[in-house]
Amino acid sequence: MPPPRRKNNGPIVALVLFGTVLLGVGTIGIIAATRSDRVSDAGYAGYSSASPTYTYSATTTTTTDTTAPSATTASKSTSTTPSKPPGPQAVYKLGDHPLFRGDLGTFDVNGCALPKMDYSPAGEDRFLQAALPCIEAMWKPVFQRTELPYQPVELQVFTGTTQTPCGSRQNNATAMYCRGVIYWPGGFYANEAGMPPHPGKYLGQLGHEYGHHIQWLSGMLKAADNAQYDAGGWDTRTGLELNRRKELQATCFGGMTLAPLSHGAIPLDVVNEGLSDASNRGDGSRTPDHGSTENNGRWVMHGHKTNRTNACNTWMANAADVA
């Protein structure tokens, strides 16, 4: 169910999108310049051997042909039986993904000890690394309940330029997620135009990036990439809409991440600042690949208030709700 709109725009038309087995393509990040043009991340969605997967082992049975003057033995053809080891497997679906069953929400944590914020790259790294175990504790049980694969996210705070499997990245742009790793530009958010630094901003953006990790682990990120490939690329009209659905879902998951923290784990003003920051990001006049500022605000608050994964099913939302 999408978040309530400020105005009544009629009934919602469901859009169900399914992934294929084709190779996915990554999306290109937009560097924010003004408050209305700020985007939350690059939204890269590439896959690698680090993605949840399994290997097949072959069991082969053969017989040898033998020929004698008095008899001939018929040969049996070689057979290979693939076997999938037990354990959680990613599900490459979108609107009907098992993560959207109705009883799933992030779990409360007994406090989250965060250091005093120091806006140097080293200080940002200490703060974010301290927050991650709290976020992992909220989300890991969700994956266990749905029998989906789980692994902790990695975080790299960098200065200058860094190389990633999704391409190079400079620290004059927003954070980027790629294949199990959050690449965080040291110093960028402390000097972002239009908004002074605040610890809540960092938690809000970390929640969004972790939202991409949820998509990657579950298989939705690959399914979305496949759907964009089928649509002719991420920069087609349909491809951009798919990208907005993906990014707004990460924003909604980010709102869910902030929900347990608002139950006394950290000061409430830090949570509120994280929600406010996410509510003031969007495409503005730039490439429409992350969603409007209004829709970013609606989805982050919807995720925060409901704390249910099915509330973040942007794949089933009306097109107006993901504009």
List where the protein language model places each region.
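Active-site recognition of the HExxH zinc-binding catalytic motif
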Residues: 139, 204-219, 250-251
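Short helix/loop segments within enzyme catalytic domains
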Residues: 244-281
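Pan-zinc metallopeptidase signature
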Residues: 279-323
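Post-HEXXH active-site segment of zinc metalloproteases
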Residues: 218-243
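Acidic/histidine-rich, surface-exposed loop or edge segments in extracytoplasmic proteins
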Residues: 106-125
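Auxiliary, metal-adjacent structural segments of Zn-dependent hydrolase domains
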Residues: 126-179, 244
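Hydrophobic single-pass membrane-targeting/anchoring helices
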Residues: 2-101
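Active-site scaffold of zinc-dependent metalloenzymes
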Residues: 165-200, 216
